[in-house]
Amino acid sequence: MLSPRARAAVRLALDEDLVSADRVLSRAPCDATSVALVDPDAVAVGEIYPKCAEGCVVSGATVARAVMRAVDPRVKVKILKPDGSFAKKGERILEFRGRARSILAAERTALNFMQRMCATATLARRFVDATRRWGTLILDTRKTTPGLRVFEKYAVLCGGGTNHRMGMYDRVLMKDNHRRLWRGGDPDALDQAVIAARRAFPKLEEEVEVESLRECASAL
């Protein structure tokens, strides 16, 4: 089940393909080519699988299913490789069956999500595997594609990584700009910054980025 924010992003992605931006050329969702050429009663089957030789970590299978069902709830989708599993080249991740027009309208959006998410998950897994012996956590950041954060951070989880913070609302993180603005950047005043943050948001974790042992000692 996708979150409301994820469902809204799926809807927006479909609208980019199926609804005219000015609502003049198309007043209803429309795949013009399929409407012109494909019998409305035609049935099609399809599948999604990795083409890359090295395979991939699966991420976004549930999103692809949501895309298909958002276009046509009657499309039957079967997930064969769940998110977080590994799929070899040519190994089917999911298969679907339904009205050909519906599948053609949804397939590119479904693939766009899956390609990006599988790539992110696969890269995250490489970092996780490379550092596993030291018990290192691989964290993500907020440097995400606008509107796609929920998917990209989920992909990091599928790859074995760890979400750092979803936004600016769920953790206090004092960076260089905050340090400069706090009491003129006094390196000995970070302890008071931590106290002020804790007083304002007592239930949130606090982190401080430091650039010297002096700043570290003050923050601690």
Model-derived regions: residue spans:
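Acidic/glycine-rich phosphate/pyrophosphate-binding loops and surrounding catalytic core
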Residues: 1-220
